[in-house]
Amino acid sequence: MWLLKKLIQRDIDLSPLRFQTCRLLLGNVWNRELTIIQRRILRRLRNRKRSIKKRKIYSKKYLTSYIQLQTTRKLSLFYGDLPITEMHRGTKRTSYIPFLLNLETRFDVILLRLHFLETIPQARQLISHRRVCVNKGMVSITHFKLSHGDIISFQENNAIIRGEEIRRSFYKEILVEKIIGKLLHQPLRMWRRSKTEWFHLLKTKRGCRLLLKSRFLQQLRSSMQEEDLERTKKFGSEKVCLGSSFAEHKRMKRNLLKSLFLSKRRKDKNLNLPTRTISPIVYNSSLSLYSNSTYCFASPHKLTMKRRIKRIELPTHYLEVNYRTPKAVVFYGPNIGHIPHDIRLKDLNLLLWSRNGRGQNI
């Protein structure tokens, strides 16, 4: 009996070793950004920090070292199994920015920045299952460092499914949450649907055709095409800059706010009401390591209110993405390279279902 209990205890202790690393993460890897264990660690770290500040047991020197250890643990939660000794390697280091930029060149992190996948555990799972290629070769190392000019692609059998999932999530996130959610207060019959109804509609061909025929989306598309023409006249070729945030999301929101602002001004002119000259909300971000603080104004229907926004950005990598294939080319530094001959740049012109079944560019 004692021997049987001992064997059962040994099997329980060694049970995690039988599974892969992705299976050790509790919860649904595909839908959660942090697992239950990771959230518990973060909660304990926050409670520990508050208790130290309240009791004032340690001196300021020990408190700062403890906060540094906290930040390394939080970084390891995001970037995976991160060795803490690597953070403290070298006494001449004055900043952690080069270290963070080095972490941003990892294969799993770049897949997340590309918005090919939603979470880093999801990216690690695909890499470990050998589904993603670098320069047409299979890579199964999650912390693989990508160099300048590397081409990221999926296998042929997995590329079509992955491309459809990316496009559907892209349209759900932009059109349902960002655009349609803003226009629900307008008396338009088409937009007065609940969020779940739009999620179900965008999965079908009928919903995509209904969205393509909308006058609002056609106006938004024409304004963005005019912007592209002006950009090509200035710089000579189409270029897309994607960093830690999705640049096209910001661009669509900016055009949306601009169109709403212009329609508001037209209504005020028709009513012969005195209007204030207020510029629309525009965020100007520079490509330096620490971008300058920018100014923005309030919405047109409010009083003029000037706010100062302080922003710190890390321009780590610039990517040229094709969401139809899907493929991407990695470029580091402030300059974006030229588009290769075998990749067509489809930044916003993603594929939607149409009547002929091949799709229609939006």
From Swiss-Prot:
SMART domains referenced in this protein's UniProt entry, alphabetically: S4
First-listed, main subcellular location of the protein, grouped into a coarse class: mitochondrion
Subcellular location: Mitochondrion
Keywords tagged on the record: Mitochondrion, Ribonucleoprotein, Ribosomal protein, RNA-binding, rRNA-binding
GO biological process, one term: ribosomal small subunit biogenesis
Keyword set includes RNA-binding: yes
Domain S4 RNA-binding intervals: 105-179
Signal peptide annotation: none
GO MF annotation: an example: rRNA binding
Subunit annotation: Component of the mitochondrial ribosome small subunit.
Recorded family membership: Belongs to the universal ribosomal protein uS4 family.
Entries under PANTHER family matching the protein: 30S 40S RIBOSOMAL PROTEIN (PTHR11831), SMALL RIBOSOMAL SUBUNIT PROTEIN US4M (PTHR11831:SF30)
Protein name as annotated: Small ribosomal subunit protein uS4m
Species of origin: Arabidopsis thaliana
